[in-house]
Amino acid sequence: MGATIKTDVVIVGAGPTGLSLACQLVRHGVGFVVVEKNEGVTPYSKAIGVHARTLEIYEQLGLAREAVERGTVAGKVRLLSGGEVRGEFDLSEVGEGLSPYPYVLMLEQSKNERLLYGYLKSHGRDVLWNTALESFSQTEEGVTAFVKTADGESQTVEARYLVGCDGAKSPVRHALGLAFEGSTFERTFYVADAQVDWRFAHDALTVSLSKETFVVFFPLKGERRYRVVGVFPEEFAKDEGEVLYEEIEARVKAEAEIDLDIHDVEWFSTYKVHTRHVESFAAGRCFLAGDAAHIHSPAGAQGMNTGIQDAYNLAWKLALVLKGSAAEGLLDTYNEERLENAKNLLRTTDRMFQLAAGPEWLLSFVRTNVFPAVAGYLFSLDSVKRFVFPLVSQIGINYRHGSLSRHEGDGDFKVKAGDRMPYFKVEGESVYDRLRGPKFHLLGFTDERGAVRMSDAGAEGKYADLVDCQTLPLSGQAAEAFGTDGPFQVLLRPDNYVGHISAGASTGGWEAYLDDLCRPSGR
């Protein structure tokens, strides 16, 4: 048996969620060990949609630009029915003014994993590949994990906390005995990555709508390269592993009703769609994140992005507790915030999926006749864009009802405690450029520089290590984003969600917030 490894956090699983958590812990200066049963990052494309909120998180890691360069922006949506184009609408700037990344990026899971793994390697960290979790136990003081390497050597990892990022069949979840309730869509889905030759330019996410269902062609990096996704009919009786590629190709051609040639298939698979969430994201000193905690329909490409946000939410809380800057009760808010988000996500994706794939005659009529006719007009309206983009891109996720959101002073603002910090520019640059440090951010907005003197209350004293204080000009964009033209202060959590907001220069609100949440230096 090898020597015992001692660390702060043991992460089980090195998919997008586990790697994201590891990267965030690097930012926060927290020790960790990642164990992964596979030999390296996935070679398969798997998930492909990367949304604005994920790119904003990547930006803090210095990875956003490279992600965009490696992927393909979905410039528009093309709607087909009966083999003919029924409508088109632009997607290239659908979220303009709402995020630095106002689009949907097509970037395969394999490339996301390589990006994140590259970040770890560049910071001198690695993953224990070919290492499987065999069992674990926990006490009030910590967690002990027993793992086995590819050569059969057993090893012990002792940590303060364990996080299961080990997928939909999560051994960690099973060992914790946590229920994973939900439902299964009975029809079988298919997916293939291939070259598609047809009359259309490689510039759009193309959706072919039919009476029974749909076929979607997602443009990927590379000439005429697409991800093709669709559904077999209800009477299709084969098990997932028995389906031949030729059956998928025949189905695509039958549903699309257009002349096309599919070749150079890189990967294909079939699967059933499940919608489930765990009863709790936490049990003692163990946590679940990503597919280990929630799975849902592929509608809206939410899965990988949601797991990355799970990791982002948990990392800063673990860091504060492990460094002695907050009580362990802070970790309870991970389950509070992310379980509620998972429930909302499942409801939303289920509705989207039912509209896209439901066989009922009314849905069929709407899918093939009504939606293609009105979609272009609807998505030309700013009001629709400002509703749909935050919903799909995940920038609209909020924690307004959580215990970390203090609403005493936010009544007069458009932005509420629990909301993501809105995007706008300050002196020509993204406000997010000022918020990259892994700290709380106390921002004073004023039309007279220096009028809001936050340091007077001791932020540069007892909270000096935890809070970054800045005074920013109250520009037109800032005033519009927050809905006020008078001086105000906003305290952002380390994940850039609003904890507290108040008018004027009073220090009482945000200082009381930090007093409740943190343990100031010297206490």
Feature locations, PLM:
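Conserved FAD-binding catalytic core of PHBH/FMO-like flavoproteins
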Residues: 69, 85, 118, 161, ...
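A conserved short coil-to-beta-strand element within the FAD-binding core of flavoproteins
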Residues: 129-143
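Active-site-adjacent segment of FAD-dependent monooxygenases/related oxidoreductases
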Residues: 43-46, 50-121
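N-terminal Rossmann-like FAD-binding beta1-loop-alpha1 element of flavoenzymes
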Residues: 7-34
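Core beta-strand elements of the Rossmann-like FAD/NAD(P) dinucleotide-binding domain
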Residues: 5-7, 151-161
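Helical substrate-recognition/capping region of FAD-dependent monooxygenase/halogenase enzymes
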Residues: 2-8, 12, 28, 81-84, ...
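Residue-level detector of alpha-helix initiation sites
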Residues: 15-16, 41, 167
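FAD/FMN-dependent oxidoreductases across multiple families
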Residues: 70, 241-306, 326, 331, ...
